[in-house]
């Protein structure tokens, strides 16, 4: 379900409170679900959960890194991610903005 980078980051939370660890996993799952829904496919063969990694910019803003077949099958689009979590909820919103470079077939 989680990418190697996410599992490594989670392992660093070993001494963190149980709520912090649960919040980390819930937020990462929420991003995967939100991305798959933005694609309109759900979590299926075109969108593989452990090929979607949530990372953070230096200023803390989250972004998505795609890999493997999920990247290969991804539309040409800018991915916008908003992520919030407060016990007991984790909410992610993903918007795919069409890449109008002219190289796309127009599908998202």
Go through each PLM region and give its residues.
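Core catalytic alpha/beta fold that binds nucleotide/phospho-ligands
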Residues: 1-108
